[in-house]
Amino acid sequence: MTKTEKKLRHYITKAIADYKLLDKGDKVMLCLSGGKDSFGLLKVLHGLIEDKTYDIDLHVYTLDQSQPGWDDSQLRKYLDDLGVSYEIETKNTYGVVIDKVPEGKTYCSLCSRLRRGNIYRYAKEHKMDKIILGHHRDDLIQSLLMSILYQGQIKSMPPKFVTQDGENTVIRPMVLVQERDLIEFAKEENFPIIPCNLCGSQENLKRKKVKKLIQDLALENPKVPSNILNSLSNVLPSHLMDRNLFDIDATIK
């Protein structure tokens, strides 16, 4: 086991313990997009199950969105060799996105909603206890700033949440994992990564701008990324302006 994998194991098991993400006997569905993050999570979590660290029933779900150039042959071979239960479901969400999104606009929002809808549907149909997503620490940091800058809200990606209809529980075991470690792990393991040609062709994405902003700030102060992450668990409601968080009448007497 490499130092990188040991590091990933440490932060993943810490998040699972800190936020009580898994219970004994859980039937869980890990969403494998074909990218480095979900591949890394799968490899580590599968190893932890093999080592008897977790007693859970793991099922891998991949959504083929019918994007041009999609080839999952190597992904299938990888999953077969790993020996995990999996299903690759084909839904032409790509066609819907191309039809609905005006030229020049980004596809990410609609694409994500359609993908999320299929994930939730599949989880309910197969009576999954939990849905596992591969978002990492940098995703949380970027999402917080994006919400503030572009939506006027303070929110990010929680380690665990229940969907609005109460039907699905979603967990993110990699909320403490840095992207750079996942990049290194993907190189070490030579995962059969499937690039997202749809997203990759759109250069002016908001997330890329925010990511660059954080990187620039970190050059001046390396603690910036960790400070942003820590802010998500160090909230001072009395220092905000949401009237639902405090008694406005009491504060003006």
Curated annotation (Swiss-Prot):
It is an enzyme of class 2 (transferase). Its cofactor is Mg(2+); [4Fe-4S] cluster. This is tRNA-cytidine(32) 2-sulfurtransferase 2. Its EC number is 2.8.1.-. Belongs to the TtcA family. InterPro entries: Rossmann-like_a/b/a_fold, TilS/TtcA_N, tRNA_Cyd_32_2_STrfase, tRNA_thiolation_TtcA_Ctu1. NCBIfam families: PRK10696.1.
